[in-house]
């Protein structure tokens, strides 16, 4: 299966039990910042934004004072799982990032999608990739 299929079929799909509700944007990005696959709506990010995200996974709390920046958008960092999941909030939307052995799985959402639904979609794919050794 191509990485684009993972994004299309597992991240940008309808939320289970909520037809028509889906993430706004999604991507799978290598730890080095190389994009493996992304939705057409995923923001163009700067290398320093990806470096900040990777630093926060290695040093949890790194982004808390400044916020998480992606594609020029600033998200307030909210409770995640140290070294495994970063969550951010901006207005009625937000972002979830799950770290796997080789990649970061990104999901960006706006209402009516809830933070919990975004977490479920992103973390389910991230856990699957971890099980596959990726």
From Swiss-Prot:
Subcellular localization: Cytoplasm, Cytoskeleton
InterPro entries tied to this protein: PFN (IPR048278), PFN_euk (IPR005455), PFN_sf (IPR036140), Profilin_CS (IPR027310)
Disulfide bridges in this chain: 13-118
Cellular component GO terms, alphabetical: cell cortex; cytoskeleton
Pfam families found in the cross-reference section: Profilin
Residue positions, PTM Phosphothreonine: 114
Highest taxon of the lineage: Eukaryota
GO terms, molecular function: actin monomer binding
Keyword tags: Actin-binding, Allergen, Cytoplasm, Cytoskeleton, Disulfide bond, Phosphoprotein
Residue window of motif Involved in PIP2 interaction: 84-100
Posttranslational modification: Phosphorylated by MAP kinases.
PROSITE patterns in alphabetical order: PROFILIN (PS00414)
Primary site of residence: cytoplasm
Subunit structure: Occurs in many kinds of cells as a complex with monomeric actin in a 1:1 ratio.
PANTHER family, per database record: PROFILIN, PROFILIN-5
Family: Belongs to the profilin family.
Function: Binds to actin and affects the structure of the cytoskeleton. At high concentrations, profilin prevents the polymerization of actin, whereas it enhances it at low concentrations.
Further remarks about this protein from its record: The variability of the residues taking part of IgE-binding epitopes might be responsible of the difference in cross-reactivity among olive pollen cultivars, and between distantly related pollen species, leading to a variable range of allergy reactions among atopic patients.
Protein name, UniProt field: Profilin-4
């Amino acid at each position: 299966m191509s990485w684009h299929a993972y994004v299309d079929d597992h991240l940008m799909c309808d939320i289970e039990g909520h037809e028509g509700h889906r993430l706004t944007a999604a991507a799978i990005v290598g730890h080095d910042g190389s994009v493996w696959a992304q939705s057409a709506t995923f923001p163009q990010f700067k290398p320093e934004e990806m470096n900040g995200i990777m630093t926060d996974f290695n040093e949890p709390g790194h982004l808390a004072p400044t916020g998480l920046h992606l594609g020029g958008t600033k998200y307030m960092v909210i409770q995640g799982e140290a070294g495994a999941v970063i969550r951010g909030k901006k207005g009625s939307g937000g972002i979830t990032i799950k770290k796997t052995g080789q990649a970061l799985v990104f999901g960006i959402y706006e209402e009516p999608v809830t933070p919990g639904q975004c977490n479920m979609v992103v973390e389910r794919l991230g856990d699957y990739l971890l099980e596959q050794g990726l």
